[in-house]
Design a protein with these regions (language model features):
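Conserved short "hinge" loops at termini or chain/domain junctions
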Residues: 3-6, 10-33
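Short, compositionally biased low-complexity segments
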Residues: 4-9, 49-58
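Short, charged/polar micro-motifs that form catalytic or ligand-binding hotspots
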Residues: 1, 18, 22, 34-38, ...
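Amphipathic alpha-helical segments that form the core helices of the histone-fold
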Residues: 27-55
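Mature-region segments of soluble proteins
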Residues: 58-152
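Generic structural signal for hydrophobic core residues of well-folded globular domains
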Residues: 12-18, 36, 52-56, 74, ...
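Basic/polar N-terminal segments that are highly enriched at the extreme N-terminus
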Residues: 1-3, 152
């Protein structure tokens, strides 16, 4: 795996709380990095990856508060939060106008679903112990289970 791709996965693992192995299992790592490059430009993505704490890039443990510091950073917090949402929901959320004015982005920076595969691979489903509605079957024999009473 190219070092840049590995840096993106390492940063994403810290942002999402999922391991690099789990993120690779979604099949979305390359697609999300490509999406990010299409929105921010490769140069801005490289700056973001460079801003991410160095400890995560090696075998050393991430310093406590490092992720919070990145999320709260005025320069890199907005794209870091958008990346986190992309992993969980399979959607890109448009960056704030002030950030866009300062850093510049491409026209692709709009609220949008990255792809149908991204929706299905969203970490929200794993976190909730659910399946993507309308995209995956519930499992063999699920038709035989009684309908859940939503009133209770």
């Amino acid at each position: 795996m190219p070092p840049r791709h590995q840096l993106f996965v390492d940063m994403s693992a810290a942002l999402t709380g999922f391991s690099p192995f789990q993120l690779h299992g979604t099949g979305m790592t390359a697609a999300y990095l490509t999406e990010l490059d299409a929105i921010l430009t490769e140069d801005l993505v490289d700056q973001l990856l460079a801003a991410f704490p160095r400890a995560v890039h090696g075998s050393a443990a991430l310093e406590p508060g490092a992720v919070d510091a990145l999320l709260e950073d005025p320069a890199w917090g907005p794209p870091a939060r958008a990346i986190t949402l992309m992993w969980y929901c399979g959607t890109w959320t448009r960056l704030p106008d002030a950030w866009r004015a300062e850093h510049g982005v491409r026209d692709h920076d709009t609220d949008h679903v990255v792809s149908t595969a991204a929706y299905q691979a969203g970490l929200q489903w794993v976190a909730a112990g659910a399946h993507p509605i309308g995209a995956r079957q519930q499992g063999f024999g699920s038709w035989s289970f009684p309908v859940e009473d939503l009133a209770s």
